A protein has these predicted regions:
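N-terminal secretory signal peptides and thylakoid transit peptides that target proteins
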Residues: 1-17
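Conserved beta-propeller blade signature
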Residues: 74-76, 119-121, 170-171, 223-225, ...
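Loop/turn-rich, solvent-exposed surfaces of beta-rich toroidal or solenoidal domains
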Residues: 252-302
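Blade-level signature of beta-propeller repeat domains, shared across WD40, Kelch, NHL, RCC1
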Residues: 323-354
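Surface-exposed loop and turn segments in beta-propeller and other repeat-based domains
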Residues: 48-57, 140-153, 192-205, 296-317
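Short loop/turn segments immediately following the C-termini of beta-strands
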Residues: 79-80, 125, 175-176, 229, ...
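Blade/loop signatures of beta-propeller domains
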Residues: 26-48
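Beta-rich, blade/repeat-based domains predominating
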Residues: 57-71, 101-115, 147-169, 200-223, ...
Length: 354
């Protein structure tokens, strides 16, 4: 049996085993459990039964983001008041949970930066950004930009995400606030900002919603890739804020960019309808781009199509997801998809077939 055939066989067996256990308990099978979604080399089998968390013990509200640590554990940030972070093993079992009292947890980044070990960077919509150890001990908290010279006293501030570069510099996306990307050094000193709010449908370097940010290290020099959710775009910048390029993804209101290998992954939180490209809930899917910024697969969405070099509008195909807020790419190539406003449900695993 070839490695790919073996992988497909194992993925089928794992989802079938989970389903049989559920049926033995007299519970109905979730919709689209075991369905195959995606395109080309990025096809997956849906496993909605991967997570073993007990809602009575480890409840969630919105499952905003997830990252895998170097030792293989999975860290999930939620906005449930009981805890900010749940830590899982790769089989979906909860190992532990902890809280910094954020209550509005939104962004989660794991990074070494210039440190010897990984740290977690937690972002709260209420304005707190905390660097902490992987067991939840605070190490650093960034200053409020209204108190360090970045903003005026009355400027809105509601950060959604941070990215950490190799020198430990922290890049903050103020995605629900004033739409700037703020730069801090590894000690938390404010260095500068770029971006700002735009109301124009095309305005490179300005944002209508700078929802996510990540370091893209696939090229000769690291770049900062930023989500422009409302305009269905990703935009790339130098680390000091010079605009390099952008890509338009019609119909896809994307979440943060996730770089893994040579590809960029993102959850589509809001989607379009045929002939209606407004932001609609319940139309989510996952989108995957190669290193030429071309969409190669849309798990849960329609197959990407280009016409005369231009990407045609992308829509949900099979309603596996409601509102995809993040994608965690595991070391084995599987995906775990986190969702916003989806009935306090846990993340869904997509088991890679090829």
């Amino acid at each position: 049996m070839s490695p790919l055939s073996r992988r497909s066989f194992l993925a089928s067996g794992l989802t079938a085993l989970a389903t049989s256990r559920l049926l033995a308990q007299g519970k109905p099978e979730p919709a689209h459990q075991g369905a195959v979604i995606g395109h080309g080399a990025f096809r997956y089998r849906v496993d909605k039964l991967w997570c073993k968390a007990d809602p009575a013990v480890h409840p969630v509200k919105d499952c905003h983001e997830m990252c895998q640590s170097a030792d293989g554990r999975l860290f999930l940030i939620t906005n449930h008041p009981k805890h900010d972070v749940l830590v899982f093993d790769t089989e979906g079992r909860v190992l532990t949970s902890w809280s910094l009292g954020l209550k509005t947890g939104h962004g989660l980044t794991l990074a070494k930066g210039a440190d010897v070990v990984e740290h977690a960077y937690l972002t709260s919509n209420s304005g707190r950004i905390v660097k902490c150890t992987l067991d939840g001990k605070p190490v650093l908290e960034l200053p409020d930009p209204r108190k360090c010279g970045a903003y005026g006293a009355n400027d809105p501030y509601s950060p959604t995400e941070v990215a950490v570069d190799a020198a430990g510099g922290i890049h903050v996306a103020d995605g629900y606030g004033s739409q700037f990307i703020l730069r801090f050094d590894r000690a938390g000193k404010y260095l500068g900002k770029f971006g700002g709010k735009s109301t124009q449908p095309t305005n490179p370097g300005k944002f209508m919603q700078a929802h996510g940010v990540a370091i893209d290290d696939r090229g000769p020099e690291p770049l900062l890739v930023c989500t422009e959710r409302v305009r269905n775009e990703f935009n790339w910048f130098t680390l000091d804020g010079k605009h390099v390029r952008g890509v338009y993804l019609p119909g896809a209101y994307v979440s943060r960019p996730v770089i893994s290998g040579r590809h960029l992954y993102s959850g589509v939180c809001f989607g379009a309808k045929p002939d209606d490209h407004r932001m609609w809930q319940g139309r989510g899917f996952v989108t995957i781009l190669d290193d030429r910024d071309r969409v190669v697969s849309n798990p849960g969405g329609q197959e990407p199509k280009y016409e005369a070099g231009r990407l045609k509008p992308m829509l949900q195909d099979l309603p596996v997801f409601n509102n995809c807020h993040d994608v965690c790419v595991l070391t084995d190539g599987d995906l775990i998809v986190c969702q916003w406003n989806s009935g306090s449900t846990y993340p869904i695993r997509l088991r890679k077939l090829s």
